[in-house]
Amino acid sequence: MAARLCCQLDPARDVLCLRPVGAEPCRRPVSGSLRTLPSSLPSAVPADHGAHLSLRGLPVCAFSSAGPCALRFTSARCMETTVNAPRNLPTVLHKRTLGLSAMSTTKIETYFKDCVFKDWEELGEEIRFKVFVLGGCRHKLVCAPAPCNFFTSA
C-alpha cells in the first residue's frame, strides 16, 4: 500500500513540507523511501547530501545548513522548474515573486500534492529527487548556468 502524505507549503521559507499522514506534526521535508516507510524517518535531507558532487549550475545556497531555496523531495526522474513546469505554474510563481496577486497558497499546495501522488502512487516512480523552484532562487549561481543533473542523478 502506498504512503499517504500531508503536503504543506511554508511560504516564509519557500519550502514544501511533506510528512506521512498520522505522523508527528513537523514542518520539515521527509526523505527516504516512501513505498516502504521505516519506523523512524530522518526529519530532513542532510545538509551535506551530495556535497561530493559537482556544484556546476547550483546556487550558492545549495548546501546551506538552512537548506537551498529549491523545494526538494524524493520522487521523479526529472527536475521541474518554473521553466518546464506544466499548466500556468511559471506565471503564477513569477507573480508571487513580484508580490502580485496569484494562485492561492492552498491551490499551490494542491498542485504539488497532485504531482507527488501521481508520481509515487500512480506511476510508481523510482526514488529520485524532484525539485520545484518556487519563484526562483534568491542567490547567485556558483558559476555560469549550465544543464544541471545533480537532482536527477540521486
UniProtKB/Swiss-Prot annotation:
It is found in: Host cytoplasm; Host nucleus; Host mitochondrion. Keywords: Activation of host NF-kappa-B by virus, Activator, Apoptosis, Host cytoplasm, Host G2/M cell cycle arrest by virus, Host mitochondrion, Host nucleus, Host-virus interaction, Modulation of host cell cycle by virus, Transcription, Transcription regulation. GO terms for biological process: DNA-templated transcription; symbiont-mediated activation of host NF-kappaB cascade; symbiont-mediated arrest of host cell cycle during G2/M transition; viral genome replication. Residues 68-117 are annotated as: Mitochondrial targeting sequence. GO terms for cellular component: host cell mitochondrion; host cell nucleus. InterPro entries: Transactivation_prot_X. The keyword Transmembrane does not apply. A fraction may be phosphorylated in insect cells and HepG2 cells, a human hepatoblastoma cell line. Phosphorylated in vitro by host protein kinase C or mitogen-activated protein kinase. N-acetylated in insect cells. Multifunctional protein that plays a role in silencing host antiviral defenses and promoting viral transcription. Does not seem to be essential for HBV infection. May be directly involved in development of cirrhosis and liver cancer (hepatocellular carcinoma). Most of cytosolic activities involve modulation of cytosolic calcium. The effect on apoptosis is controversial depending on the cell types in which the studies have been conducted. May induce apoptosis by localizing in mitochondria and causing loss of mitochondrial membrane potential. May form homodimer. May interact with host CEBPA, CFLAR, CREB1, DDB1, E4F1, HBXIP, HSPD1/HSP60, NFKBIA, POLR2E and SMAD4. Interacts with host SMC5-SMC6 complex and induces its degradation. Interacts with host TRPC4AP; leading to prevent ubiquitination of TRPC4AP. Interacts with host PLSCR1; this interaction promotes ubiquitination and degradation of HBx and impairs HBx-mediated cell proliferation. Belongs to the orthohepadnavirus protein X family. This is Protein X. The lineage of its organism: Viruses, Riboviria, Pararnavirae, Artverviricota, Revtraviricetes.
